[in-house]
Amino acid sequence: MSHQGKIVQCIGAVIDVEFTPGEIPKVYDALVMEGSELTLEVQQQLGDGVVRTIALGSSDGLRRGMMVTNTQKQISVPVGTKTLGRIMDVLGRPIDEMGEIGANSLMPIHRAAPAFDELSASTELLETGIKVIDLVCPFAKGGKIGLFGGAGVGKTVNMMELIRNIAIEHSGYSVFAGVGERTREGNDFYHEMKDSNVLDKVALVYGQMNEPPGNRLRVALTGLTMAEAFRDEGRDVLFFVDNIYRYTLAGTEVSALLGRMPSAVGYQPTLAEEMGRLQERITSSKTGSITSIQAVYVPADDLTDPSPATTFGHLDATVVLSRDIASLGIYPAVDPLDSTSRQLDPLIIGEDHYNTAREVQQTLQRYKELRDIIAILGMDELSPEDKLSVSRARKIQRFLSQPFFVAEVFTGSPGKYVPLKETIKGFKGIVSGEYDDIPEQAFYMVGGIEEVLEKAKSIQ
């Protein structure tokens, strides 16, 4: 049996291939073009021996009558330690011009999620060294975290800082999936990892903005498969995805090309199922854990858009980046009132941390309520208690800013890693009134509270 078919139709990235009736490929089987390295993935069986496929590469130059071979298996990618320090594409082929990967084993990119009885929950905290995150939306080891934000508020910079801090402190293996993002960012990221000497612990999988929708749709699964392989070996892995929205967008493009009727806002009707299929696999089992940090672009800053709204339900912690906070020059521009975490529970993080975080949020919420009154009547019309609340809230707001290691080139000030104990001590002091006599500018862009006191001396 030849397992060969011929192309009968090409519409952009969608290719219809005809096989003899007894040899029709299964859905998700990989087909390879004769005489080229182009791979097609079967998406639908149309009947009469015709299958509809999506091209994982450029379909330029394809024409009817060209021959295609059915590999009779799914797309499989290299896994294991040989992938570390390498940049690969959606098919696991090296794109860093450093020779073959030479991995001992391959794994198919489509797999079932672990069974319910294999899952394990974790309450161990993952310290990030970023004050605002550690205080109001702490991460769990083996949890799923989303970084939500519109265009240009700092998702990728926050992601890079988290990778730098956690990869250095955590010293485990990481997998980074660049899904439909800018090639420049992928290049910056590679060099950032190289300069931080953590490249030999990171596997990089890129499917950039300029690539066909098939590549962008599958590259997240390629990265996830590599992370799952490390987890199944009994390791604790970090899995970074930048950007989940582009994964959804690629699904929308593929869905339209396959002729499905769009649903709300033009998204694919299978949005929730596709998201669930990816997210359910990003989980910790009894053998090892996957801690996942995902950047999620929010179209037009609208958190109710179907794409970010579908992602919310799968996450343990959500870090919401706000344009209003970024416009004040406070970076990281995390909104402490919008960001949430399931770990913010006194039984997990302890009474001291919990009470400090809640008091910080209460103070900021009070300031938010008073802002309209201040804008209309001015500060003088407030009661002494409210004036004190506003003063403390402004100090908290500035103390939530922090210089990043990955942004040293732009800011000119050295990055700071703040341990959790220091963070709690600083904010506890502000809300209890310990630092009421210190000017608010001393709290801006510093690490721990000791730095604030030193800065205050130089100001006074």
Curated annotation (Swiss-Prot):
Signal sequence region: none
SMART domains referenced in this protein's UniProt entry, alphabetically: AAA
UniProt keyword terms in alphabetical order: ATP synthesis, ATP-binding, Cell inner membrane, Cell membrane, CF(1), Hydrogen ion transport, Ion transport, Membrane, Nucleotide-binding, Translocase, Transport
Membrane topology: Peripheral membrane protein
Ribonucleoprotein listed as a keyword: no
Main location: membrane
Mitochondrion found in the keyword field: no
Gene Ontology CC annotation, any one: proton-transporting ATP synthase complex
Enzyme Commission identifier(s): 7.1.2.2
Self-association state and partner proteins as the record states: F-type ATPases have 2 components, CF(1) - the catalytic core - and CF(0) - the membrane proton channel. CF(1) has five subunits: alpha(3), beta(3), gamma(1), delta(1), epsilon(1). CF(0) has three main subunits: a(1), b(2) and c(9-12). The alpha and beta chains form an alternating ring which encloses part of the gamma chain. CF(1) is attached to CF(0) by a central stalk formed by the gamma and epsilon chains, while a peripheral stalk is formed by the delta and b chains.
Family per record: Belongs to the ATPase alpha/beta chains family.
Protein name per the record: ATP synthase subunit beta
Organism: Nitrosomonas europaea (strain ATCC 19718 / CIP 103999 / KCTC 2705 / NBRC 14298)
Lineage: Bacteria, Pseudomonadati, Pseudomonadota, Betaproteobacteria, Nitrosomonadales
